[in-house]
């Protein structure tokens, strides 16, 4: 994987190797991907952050909501214990293919302008700038943190609300235009302060 080419593929964090599982080299992993079936398919290649070491998936399985992976060359408990704590990365998908498939990474949404959607339920002018996406928070459901273009102030002019959390679902975020640098929102009343 190591390359002196400055245009080498971007690596995304996929997992952290955890405890040894059994005696034959299997390990548990803490996952950081929403595509574990793809990332842990037999033959999939993962890398250390510097791209110097490759870890090839030999087999994978789930047990009680945990992924258990067997990597090529890690064949006993000693080798699996030695790998504990190693963080592995995978190659990012091709950006052009992702755009065609209407897919994106959370980091791609940060800094997009948030505008009101056409025909929004609030009845406000479409295209009205609500703010800018400053973070994508992953809890039970992804949330977009939007810094408001017009912060809400109290009677004394002190800012009391300068951001809003919007669930990242199709109904509330109907359009994303990465090339145009914006996304549209169709929030219900009360979700975004000041609207």
UniProtKB/Swiss-Prot annotation:
Main location group: cytoplasm
Subcellular locations according to the entry: Cytoplasm
A Pfam family: RimM
Alphabetized UniProt keyword annotations: Chaperone, Cytoplasm, Ribosome biogenesis, rRNA processing
Residue ranges occupied by any PRC barrel domain in the UniProt entry: 101-191
GO molecular function: ribosome binding
Subunit structure: Binds ribosomal protein uS19.
Function recorded in the entry: An accessory protein needed during the final step in the assembly of 30S ribosomal subunit, possibly for assembly of the head region. Essential for efficient processing of 16S rRNA. May be needed both before and after RbfA during the maturation of 16S rRNA. It has affinity for free ribosomal 30S subunits but not for 70S ribosomes.
HAMAP family cross-referenced by the UniProt entry: Ribosome_mat_RimM (MF_00014)
Domain notes: The PRC barrel domain binds ribosomal protein uS19.
Record family assignment: Belongs to the RimM family.
UniProt name for this protein: Ribosome maturation factor RimM
Gene behind this protein: rimM
């Amino acid at each position: 994987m190591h390359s002196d080419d400055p245009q080498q593929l971007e690596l995304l964090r996929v997992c952290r190797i955890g405890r040894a599982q059994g005696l034959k080299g299997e390990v548990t992993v803490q996952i950081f991907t929403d595509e574990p079936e793809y990332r842990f398919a037999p033959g999939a290649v993962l890398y250390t952050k510097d791209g110097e070491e490759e870890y090839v998936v030999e087999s994978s399985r789930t047990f009680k909501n945990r992924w258990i992976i067997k990597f090529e060359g890690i064949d006993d408990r000693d080798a699996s214990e030695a790998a504990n704590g190693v963080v592995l990365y995978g190659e990012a998908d091709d950006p052009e293919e992702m755009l065609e498939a209407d897919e994106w990474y959370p980091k791609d949404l940060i800094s997009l302008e948030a505008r009101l959607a056409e025909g929004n339920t609030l009845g406000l002018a479409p295209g009205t700038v609500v703010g800018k996406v400053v973070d994508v928070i992953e809890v039970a459901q992804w949330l977009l943190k939007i810094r408001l273009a017009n912060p809400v102030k109290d009677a004394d002019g002190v800012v009391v609300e300068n951001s809003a959390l919007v669930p990242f679902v199709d109904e509330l975020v109907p359009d994303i235009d990465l090339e145009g640098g914006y996304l549209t929102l169709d929030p219900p009343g009360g979700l975004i302060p000041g609207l």
